[in-house]
Swiss-Prot record:
It is found in: Cytoplasm. Its EC number is 6.1.1.5. Keywords: Aminoacyl-tRNA synthetase, ATP-binding, Cytoplasm, Ligase, Metal-binding, Nucleotide-binding, Protein biosynthesis, Zinc. Binds 1 zinc ion per subunit. It comes from Lactobacillus helveticus (strain DPC 4571). This is Isoleucine--tRNA ligase. A motif ('HIGH' region) lies at residues 57-67. One of its GO terms (cellular component) is cytosol.
Length: 927
């Protein structure tokens, strides 16, 4: 018999390489066929609920790394909750209406303006449904466990019907109204935009200082040769000027420059003088802003008057302190104009071109008018200064083109009547990171009314009829009737039925004596779609619960889904749709740049999966601090792959060395474990406690760091490092070996459970090698935290020993550098401890030679020799061990051949082999 045949060498079929791109797909197929999602929920019936509501991604194209970050984060949370005593369903959703779908059809040559509306919308539906299926396949491949057979999609009939009911309830409460006011207008999309659909970019613009001749100074300012000076970055709005706004609290200076006088805010005078180039000027008069109200000026180009009015939005940050006011082209302008009954003059059409309301500009694009106005003001002698100015300007988030403020007649949701209620609900919810609460609170506090109408085709129609005299018709009866039709036929019914067919049978109105009605042509803002999901999904669906426990999305959703959902939910029910909000940063490249095809830094999840596997993306998510922006590159993913290999290989070692361990037969009770094994069991238990607490805070980064640190330092670099001397060498069923196997097996089981939410495919593979009752680790529960009576004392003593171990390892390293020894097992170590350290070592009662991996260890009560290396609480002497290397245990021993029957072995190995392999004594032993 060969020596290796007398060793307990670990064996396992768990492969070193994961072959993840292939094996993951096999596991996912198995999960689907065995309905693991349904099985897990059935196990959790009757347990406390946890409802994470999925914010719907837009169905357009394959998923990107931002999608992966979001969906994997949600999956980790839901998997954890299900394994930790909660009934945690997860229904994935998709946002399917809106401009991107229309843009895709336009690229294919489909013209919405010439095609029948119902047929056009059917093409939109088909495209959107194809995109949903494409993304669903991508999300499944990430290993996301969800109710994939029953997703919610905003184009579903029942969803659209419930959205109509939400609108109807808000209308009934008086929160919906029709009005004309400036809104974000996208000429490139030919539609209004919500705040969440606008992104800001730095652009260059013409900034101009313009002189408006004073015509009436109310007897305070002499109008002769006197001018109000305004500053604007939108010269194209000058034709729509109706007023000049001043702050009543500011002082204004009348400044003599040559034979003319100019009025500017005193606090900006020096800055304005420098900008315009007034080298020689003199303040001849100071006037309070409050005294300037109702003064008048002449428009510098057109034959019209401009009224001086008051507004507290006027600041001393930029400009002149006198603000050009065009109520048809700005929100502040509109609001202040309402107080003075100023005309809402907005002579620009849906394409961004001037109308015949300004005949000479008819058909001109506003950006061309911008240049023309500069020239006209120059020709009129009213242009004091032209300067190119860089500022942050709103753009359409889809088309990337600039937007304008334009007064149009739209439908709005009024926020003011229930703003305080919304703010109160924000206070009651919790936010991760905590700054999210302040951010959302300030957004709601400062936001204006929500423009909910859109001039597009693909969306949920506004369920409004018009009577013969133009009166809007919305009643509880009409709303419910439309909702029921939509439940059966979908919202396309609005375009395939007449108004009469869509109204309740026999419906009449005093506003339509002839019984004639027409339908609203606009659709609802897509944010009203997703913003109603709390009702259409969480409130309405069986098995789900409202309000949701958690909303988790990117930080851009504070002005998007977090915002719109909150408004509709509080408007209808009085409460927030969520108890907690978790926001994440954006995915950037390793240099902090956004992903873009032009930069060539786009990383596709599907490409990563084909090369590395979804587990590597999942590990990347768990390693990242997602509360701020998250970096990704192939290099970063390679680091995640290295971490994965370390985890996998450690598990492989643990599985190999517990393959002959039956937890039901061989487990050693905690009180009977050796001291070092108790120490590791306690360390493992503390790790589980910390990981469960981190999971409860949705802090995957801490979970991963702590687990990886335990695997790398406590297991690989310590416990499993010296384990071979026991696991391989000792008798198979010896107490020391079974004690150590108990801990290693516990670590494998508990770490597999803890890591399942993060690495479900790999942990499922590992679970197949463990001897547990559950067929799948996902059907097991999270490990329970034990309470060990000797916890504190044990950790305290072992912490002291670990400090001593570090010092001894340094002494061994010194001996290695001095060529006294090669590897540590060649050493004979003598430790001279002080009294406290000696007491600690006696208390621990461990095999310290085994733990230090040396051939001989002596704990001496004698005084340390002068050449001993002084440590903090002991002295140490390292020498080369005397004797020969035992070919079985690889230790240097002086008792080789002590047993004549087994002359090549040391006494320890001879005893083990003779007792367990009696045939060896007869047949002899080969190397």
């Amino acid at each position: 018999m060969k020596i290796k045949d007398t060793l307990n060498l670990g064996k396992t079929k768990f492969k070193m390489r994961g072959n993840l791109p292939v094996r993951e797909a096999e596991w996912q197929k198995q999960w689907r066929e065995n309905k693991l999602y349904e099985q897990r929920l059935k196990l959790n019936e009757g347990k406390p609920r946890f409802d994470l509501h999925d914010g719907p991604p837009f169905a357009n194209g394959n998923i990107h790394m931002g999608h992966a970050l979001n969906k994997i984060s949600k999956d980790i949370i839901v998997r954890y909750k299900n394994m930790n005593g909660y009934y945690a369903p997860y229904v994935p959703g998709w946002d399917t209406h809106g401009l991107p779908v229309e843009q895709q059809l336009a690229k294919k040559g489909v013209d919405r303006k010439t095609m029948d509306r119902a047929k056009y919308r059917e093409l939109c539906r088909q495209y959107a449904e194809e995109q949903v299926q494409k993304q669903m396949t991508d999300f499944k491949r990430l290993g996301v466990m969800a109710d994939w057979d029953h997703p919610y999609i905003t184009l579903q009939h029942d969803f659209e019907a419930q959205e109509i009911r939400v609108f109807g309830e808000m209308f009934k409460k008086g929160y919906i109204y029709k009005g004309k006011k400036p809104v974000y207008w996208s000429w490139s999309s030919e539609s209004t935009l919500a705040e969440a659909e606008v992104e800001y970019k730095d652009v260059e613009a013409n900034s101009i200082f313009v002189a408006f001749p004073v015509t009436d100074g109310k007897g305070i300012i002499d109008p002769k040769d006197t001018y109000f000076v305004i500053w604007t970055t939108t010269p194209w709005t000058i034709p729509a000027n109706e007023a000049i706004c001043v702050n009543p609290k500011f002082d204004y200076s009348v400044v003599q420059v040559g034979d003319k006088r100019y009025v500017v805010a005193s606090g900006l005078l020096d800055k304005v003088a420098e900008e315009i180039g007034w080298d020689d000027y003199k303040v001849v008069q100071t006037v309070k802003g409050a005294d300037m109200e109702y003064m008048k000026a002449k428009h510098p180009i057109y034959d019209k008057e401009s009224l001086v009015i008051e507004g507290f939005h006027v600041t001393l940050d930029d400009g002149t302190g006198l603000v050009h006011t065009a109520p048809g082209f700005g929100e502040d302008d509109f609001n202040v104009g309402q107080r003075y009954n100023l005309p809402i003059f907005s002579p620009v059409d849906a394409h961004g071109c001037y109308t015949d309301e300004v005949p000479e500009l008819k058909g001109m694009f506003y950006q061309d008018v911008d240049k023309l106005m500069v020239q006209k003001l120059k020709d009129a002698g009213a242009l004091l200064k032209l300067k190119i100015f860089t500022h942050s300007y709103p753009h359409d988030w889809r088309t990337k083109k600039p937007v304008i403020f334009r007064a149009t007649t739209q439908w709005f949701a009024s926020i003011a009547p229930f703003r305080d209620q919304i703010l109160d609900q924000i206070e009651k919810a919790s936010f991760i990171p905590s700054w999210g609460k302040t951010r959302l609170y300030n957004m709601i506090k400062d936001r204006g009314d929500w423009v909910i109408s859109r001039q597009r085709a693909w969306g949920v129609p506004l369920p409004i009829f018009y009577a013969e005299d133009g009166t809007p018709i919305v009643t509880p009866e009409t709303i419910e009737h439309i909702a029921k039709i939509f439940e059966k036929e979908g919202s396309n019914a609005w375009y395939t039925h007449t108004a009469k067919e869509l109204l309740p049978e026999g419906f009449t109105s005093e506003h339509s004596p002839n019984g004639e009605f027409t339908k609203e042509k606009d659709i609802l803002d897509v944010w009203f779609d997703s913003g109603s999901s709390w009702s259409g999904v969480m409130e309405k669906r069986d098995g789900l619960h409202y309000p949701a426990d958690l909303y988790l999305e990117g930080s851009d959703q504070y002005r998007g889904w977090f915002n719109s959902s909150l408004i509709t939910s509080v408007a209808v029910t009085g409460q927030a749709p969520y108890k907690q909000v978790l926001s994440q940063g954006f995915v950037l490249d390793d240099k902090g740049h956004k992903m873009s095809k032009s930069l060539g830094n786009v990383i596709s999840p599907n490409d990563v999966i084909k090369k590395m596997g979804a587990e590597i993306i999942r590990l990347w998510v768990a390693q990242a601090d997602t509360t701020s922006d998250v970096a990704v590159s192939m290099g970063i993913l390679q680091q995640s792959a290295e971490s994965y290999r370390k985890i996998r290989n450690t598990f492989r070692y643990m599985l190999a060395n517990t393959s002959d361990f039956d937890p039901k037969e061989n487990r050693v009770a905690y009180d009977d474990l050796r001291s070092v094994d108790q120490y590791m069991e306690v360390k493992l238990n503390d790790l589980i406690k910390e990981c469960l607490a981190a999971y409860d805070k949705f802090d995957f980064t801490t979970v991963f760091k702590k687990v990886f640190n335990f695997i790398s330092n406590d297991l690989s670099a310590f416990y499993l490092d010296f384990a071979k001397d026991v696991l391989y060498i000792e008798v198979e069923n010896s107490h020391a070996r079974r004690s150590m196997q108990t801990v290693i097996y516990d670590a494998a089981v508990k770490l597999a459970k803890i890591l399942t939410p993060i690495l479900p495919h790999t942990m499922e593979e590992i679970w197949g090698f463990l001897k547990e009752d559950e067929d799948y680790v996902q059907l097991a529960n999270m490990p329970e935290v034990e309470n060990y009576a000797n916890h504190d004392e044990l950790l305290e003593n072992w912490a002291k020993f670990m400090k001593l171990r570090d010092d001894v390892l340094k002494a061994l390293e010194d001996a290695r550098n001095k060529k006294l020894i090669g590897k540590s097992f060649e050493a004979a170590v003598t430790i001279y401890p002080d009294k406290e350290t000696k007491a600690m070592l006696d208390e621990l009662d461990a095999d310290f030679r085994e733990i230090l991996i040396v051939s001989k260890l002596t704990i001496s009560d004698d005084e340390a020799p002068v050449d001993a290396e002084q440590l903090a609480n002991a002295a140490v002497v390292v020498k080369h061990a005397e004797g020969e290397v035992c070919p079985r245990c690889r230790m240097i021993r002086t008792d080789i051949g002590a047993d004549p029957k087994l002359p090549m072995l040391c006494g320890r190995c001879a005893e083990i082999v003779e007792a367990n392999y009696p045939e060896v004594v007869q047949e002899g032993l080969e190397k």
